[in-house]
Amino acid sequence: KGYRRTQKGEAEMDESVKINKIAFIGGDMRQVRAINRISESGREVAVFGFNRDVIHKMDNSVVKAENIAAIPSDIRVFVLPLPYSMDGENIKAPFFDGTITISELLRATPPESVLLAGRADARLEALAEVYGIRLIDYFKREELMVLNAVPTAEGAIQLALEETPHTLCGSECLVTGYGRIGKILAHKLVLLGANVTVSARKPSDLAYVKAFGYNALNTENLRTVKRFDIVFNTIPKLIFDRELLMNTDTNTLIIDLASLPGGVDFDTAEKLGIYAVRALSLPGKCAPKTAGEIIKTTVFDIIKEVYR
């Protein structure tokens, strides 16, 4: 049975998560944290795709499979990394000395199993259907995206502090986009004393920007960013093209938080002498422990819904 902690710290049985056996295949330190937390909750966790150095950091009760075939045959929930693959062919396993092909994994996965993968694509969806496996992209879960925005925002602030010779307090900061990351980032910047402008397109977003006391700017009217010390882009489409970069001060730091292909023409920025940083996967880099907790929580939420 699983356990959860009450506010007073006592262990209390968690009856809502009915699946007690889970396998993790590959991943980084986020997965290691999630593995340990799920194991500590009283569940059986089997893993494959990690080297000995990383395995030694896992809970003693975790089942360390030598190969995919050695994963206990009664496990029906499999968790892949975020993202599940970097090339569409192999499972992302940075702590593994070999490779784990997606086809190899799916052939060994029992039909009607549940496969949780981060950033699942059309190829994985098609293969899962062929093998009769239920695929769920946990990166699309709202709770994960909202909670992940916190370490993303903090990681962006860390980058800004490292890459600028001045404090954030009193700095002119522009946040482009007012989605999950933009909302949390703008709030944290204001708390640090920055002068924050937020650009958005939707009238409702611009209304919220004003209501929270930020300077509002319609992204459609973004013609120059010369007055800003730091720009944080969260919009996953090309915003900072050649025309806008020509109207950007060379002392302005641009931090692109948007998923690929991103929102900055990096080649042009380099030619113009503008320092632009592509900051991807910040939760796993800056706060793997917290990011692992978020994955664990999301996995449990999905299991509760699937196995009611």
Regions found by a protein language model. Give the residues of each.
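Rossmann-like adenosine-cofactor binding region
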Residues: 65-66, 83-87, 101-112, 209-284
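Glycine/serine-rich phosphate-binding loop and adjoining beta1-alpha1 elements at the start
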Residues: 14, 80-169, 298
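NAD(P)-binding Rossmann-fold cofactor-contacting core
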Residues: 42-57, 192-212
